[in-house]
Amino acid sequence: MPEMDKSNDFFEENPCPNSLGDVSSLIEDFINLQSNSQNIAFVTSGGTLVPLEQNTVRFIDNFSAGNRGAASAEYFCKSGYSVIFLYRNYSLMPFTRRYEGPWTNLFERSNGSQEKPWIVKQEFQSTVFNALNELDTYTKHHRLIMIPYTTLTEYLWYLKAIAERLQIIASRALFYLAAAVSDFHIPPKELSEHKIQSGSGSNKLEVKMHPVPKFLRFLVDTWAPEASIISFKLETDPSILIDKARVALQRYNHQLVIANLLSTRKRSVAFVTSKTVEWLHLSDDDIVKKVEIEQYIVSRAISLHKERIQEFAKAP
């Protein structure tokens, strides 16, 4: 079956989320508030949940805390881009991601009035207030909008809707697809209505999953044909990493794959294009100074985006 037919089947089998209309309106308003020359980065982040039941108790989830997407969104904002941040609910978010640990550890009892019995601990005040001030500045000035999702179905419906609305800015759109998207799903008609029972007499659970259509193809060909599109490839086996990235480029014909290994993803990545492979490694000194590799990834993404914008500007 052709990929386009598979895509249509997926959206027919998986009804759109009730919030799709509201999300679409928010994105349209956000785009309309930008200047005619403003570049927009569409950053996706976090994992996607695949339910095993209609009334979901059990599910399959993809590994991702969302730090790469959240950090990258920050660096895009600081580089002058406006950012649409599509993130997994409860995953890390731009600016507020900087504190790691239970949020209750941020506070202590105040010795002041009973109207404000809790205050931010002295050692966290700078981090907390700076993060909140930056987040407030970018959202208040319409430079950052954040849209949450949970399931694979929500993610794909939102991806399609946002991509179609970004068509209006053509090559000024940059897609930075850092979300960990499931390769497999279970169609709703094949889901158990209620919780799968463990005491049914069987000593095993067999789950039949179907491949998710390759929606990157539709981004490139149909949903956002003039945008710059960057995808990520995460593997655990270094012997296949670059080959898998090259296969993705050949299959989908987008601009860049950022390839990384699970064990070294925070300090090493490869920028893979149709012609080159360029490795980036943080030094030991970078690690000590807590330099984030995402600032270099975003810088490379912006350079690529500028080149593509210039190519379209020169086109007859």
Swiss-Prot record:
SUPFAM superfamilies the UniProt entry points to: CoaB-like (SSF102645)
Pfam families, alphabetized: DFP
Any one of the GO CC terms: nucleus
GO terms for MF: phosphopantothenate--cysteine ligase activity
Disulfide bridge partners, by residue number: none
Keywords from the named record: Cytoplasm, Nucleus
GO biological process, one term: coenzyme A biosynthetic process
Major localisation: cytoplasm
Superkingdom of this protein's organism: Eukaryota
Subcellular location: Cytoplasm; Nucleus
Gene3D superfamilies: CoaB-like
Similarity comment text for this entry: Belongs to the PPC synthetase family.
UniProt protein name: Uncharacterized protein C4B3.18
Organism for this UniProt entry: Schizosaccharomyces pombe (strain 972 / ATCC 24843)
